[in-house]
Amino acid sequence: MNSIDPRAIIDPSAKLADGVEVGPWSIVGPDVEIGEGTVIGPHVVLKGPTRIGKHNRIFQFSSIGEDTPDLKYKGEPTRLVIGDHNVIREGVTIHRGTVQDRAETTVGDHNLIMAYAHIGHDSVIGNHCILVNNTALAGHVHVGDWAILSGYTLVHQYCHIGAHAFSGMGTAIGKDVPAFVTVFGSPAEARSMNFEGMRRRGFSDEVIHVLRRCYKIVYRQGLTVEDALKELAEPATQHPEVELFRQSILSSARGITR
């Protein structure tokens, strides 16, 4: 059974699964689907086309699925898809996509999106990510699984943040951040790898040691990116984590943060 506060406004075309809660003064617009067990707090605005999965919690004053402010957007049908078990805290804004890209903004599963964070149009957020308060992602940004972006991190459009990467507070990211890399500063500079995060997630000492050596190859030996990638080729055949690091560099379109 759903629990809908009588002061909420639910469009007749919205689809709410069993166990959904909607708080007072929230608005659920046309073409919005909400999965089982999701809790919508007070004063939340959901605009479609938006699909929200199961067992999410969205806190007050969040705006989810609004039109993009991209000046090229002319009202074309685009959407937002949010997975399961996400926590979206107070005042978060997430925009739908544009037809110039994927026409979809995507948020995966088990993410924590903290107060006043912004996810721009056509962005893709993986699983188990943390976006700390006031983090702002421009359009077309990709964030890999388990990445952590500390408070007030700013990410330029089209940047890719690799899996397990970490940014310090107030970091301004203008280039891609490879998997596992820790960046700080404005503009961002690579400082190390997220070894503490690896330990917490059960990475073996051997893998951490190998990744440490690979980081030094890319960032401490004065090699070009092309030459560093050649040096990573052999260890990448033995360790999938190194291959993940290598591929995140190889696939970079904007160049990597160094």
From Swiss-Prot:
Annotated keywords: Acyltransferase, Cytoplasm, Lipid A biosynthesis, Lipid biosynthesis, Lipid metabolism, Repeat, Transferase
An example Gene Ontology CC term for this record: cytoplasm
InterPro entries, per the entry: Acetyltransf_C, Acetyltransf_C_sf, Hexapep, Hexapep_transf_CS, Lipid_A_LpxA, Trimer_LpxA-like_sf
Enzyme nomenclature, EC number: 2.3.1.129
Enzyme class: transferase
Catalytic activity: a (3R)-hydroxyacyl-[ACP] + UDP-N-acetyl-alpha-D-glucosamine = a UDP-3-O-[(3R)-3-hydroxyacyl]-N-acetyl-alpha-D-glucosamine + holo-[ACP]
Main localisation: cytoplasm
Keyword tRNA processing on entry: no
Compartment(s) where it occurs, according to its Swiss-Prot or TrEMBL record: Cytoplasm
SUPFAM superfamilies linked to this entry: Trimeric LpxA-like enzymes
Highest taxon listed in the record's lineage: Bacteria
Pathway(s) the chain acts in: Glycolipid biosynthesis; lipid IV(A) biosynthesis; lipid IV(A) from (3R)-3-hydroxytetradecanoyl-[acyl-carrier-protein] and UDP-N-acetyl-alpha-D-glucosamine: step 1/6
A single MF term (Gene Ontology): acyl-[acyl-carrier-protein]-UDP-N-acetylglucosamine O-acyltransferase activity
GO biological process: one example: lipid A biosynthetic process
Keyword Ribonucleoprotein: no
Function: Involved in the biosynthesis of lipid A, a phosphorylated glycolipid that anchors the lipopolysaccharide to the outer membrane of the cell.
Quaternary structure and partners: Homotrimer.
Stored NCBIfam families: lipid_A_lpxA, PRK05289.1
The protein's name in its UniProt record: Acyl-[acyl-carrier-protein]--UDP-N-acetylglucosamine O-acyltransferase
Organism lineage string: Bacteria, Pseudomonadati, Pseudomonadota, Gammaproteobacteria, Pseudomonadales
Gene assigned in the entry: lpxA
